[in-house]
Amino acid sequence: MPHNSIRSGHGGLNQLGGAFVNGRPLPEVVRQRIVDLAHQGVRPCDISRQLRVSHGCVSKILGRYYETGSIRPGVIGGSKPKVATPKVVEKIGDYKRQNPTMFAWEIRDRLLAEGVCDNDTVPSVSSINRIIRTKVQQPFNLPMDSCVATKSLSPGHTLIPSSAVTPPESPQSDSLGSTYSINGLLGIAQPGSDKRKMDDSDQDSCRLSIDSQSSSSGPRKHLRTDAFSQHHLEPLECPFERQHYPEAYASPSHTKGEQGLYPLPLLNSTLDDGKATLTPSNTPLGRNLSTHQTYPVVADPHSPFAIKQETPEVSSSSSTPSSLSSSAFLDLQQVGSGVPPFNAFPHAASVYGQFTGQALLSGREMVGPTLPGYPPHIPTSGQGSYASSAIAGMVAGSEYSGNAYGHTPYSSYSEAWRFPNSSLLSSPYYYSSTSRPSAPPTTATAFDHL
């Protein structure tokens, strides 16, 4: 085959056994043979096996041929041939002037129809748009003689020459320091500059005053939104020239406001209270944070008391401590300092606990809500009612009768109670909880007779 010449180090064999060269397209003869076989009706897979060319290469060549009609390879990694020749550019300009609303794809089809370009040299749609944008529609600042579109302009339509635009000669010609300002592009002479330079040695220029030169120059004709004049910058820089951190030192402007927010007596009293909390002292606090706030102060401490709980005679099988439900086992005794505080509740042992609060409640008042984690005590019929105010919300013992509950508890539930609707019981989908009778014994099947 004509394409089986292999360069050392740059070629090889494909999966079909055909030779190829890396980075080089198929020869023209092989491309034409692929197209001829496709015209004869040979399938691309058969063309690939017969010519020993990969299926992807065959599909790419045929797809490009069906789309553009060309079998020439595309250039990879190189520059494309110049399609925007002067003749093509002039034709595109003529089409655009005749019909300004013509689209780029219509211009491309017209170039092919009139034979200006062929399938290989016709510019793409993006190239035509670029030609119209850069060459047909001449920019405003280019000379007139280089514009192709101005050759057929009517006498009544003229363009402003570029010499009418007077760009700024230097950045100093613009009063605002910008070369591309509106006044510079429009050629408007700017009046005297209203800017003044800041004197670095003047540290007392923080007052809001207008310079005599700035006031005499008249109103400003052009105000830029992205820059501020020195007249506007001076008031903004005044606080920073005085001090960078206004909260670091007290200034006359902040003194009145701080005195209104934080009175001096209140600050002093707060500091004294803070010192009292840091140092241990037995003296009660006598000063509050403010006059309208009051706090209760414990004036007289009480003598320590202990609660002694004795084990009842009835043995208990639980490992938890007995509830202080009966007043017969409670006794308030004043103990000395030698009694250690309790840490646990061992079963069948005496428990001592010290309380240094206010006057303790009576033995019966310690039950109920005062013991968290235990249910409220319900007295029996033999025990009297509670007269303490600590458990006033509970029901008195006299209201409970010693008799047992009159109604018998339910040991089982009937079907009618569980399903009040009788239609559910008669439904074939309902299965009763009663045991079903066992199935009758079946007779001997046919397997027994075999």
Swiss-Prot record:
It comes from the Eukaryota. Changing L62R: In CHNG2; loss of activity. Its main location: nucleus. Residues 12-68 are annotated as: PAI subdomain. Residues 87-135 are annotated as: RED subdomain. Expressed in the excretory system, thyroid gland and Wilms tumors. Residues 159-222 are annotated as: Disordered. It is found in: Nucleus. GO terms for molecular function: DNA binding; DNA-binding transcription factor activity; DNA-binding transcription factor activity, RNA polymerase II-specific; RNA polymerase II cis-regulatory region sequence-specific DNA binding; sequence-specific double-stranded DNA binding; thyroid-stimulating hormone receptor activity; transcription cis-regulatory region binding. Interacts with WWTR1. It is linked to Hypothyroidism, congenital, non-goitrous, 2: A disease characterized by thyroid dysgenesis, the most frequent cause of congenital hypothyroidism, accounting for 85% of case. The thyroid gland can be completely absent (athyreosis), ectopically located and/or severely hypoplastic. Ectopic thyroid gland is the most frequent malformation, with thyroid tissue being found most often at the base of the tongue. Transcription factor for the thyroid-specific expression of the genes exclusively expressed in the thyroid cell type, maintaining the functional differentiation of such cells. This is Paired box protein Pax-8. It comes from Homo sapiens (Human). The gene is PAX8.
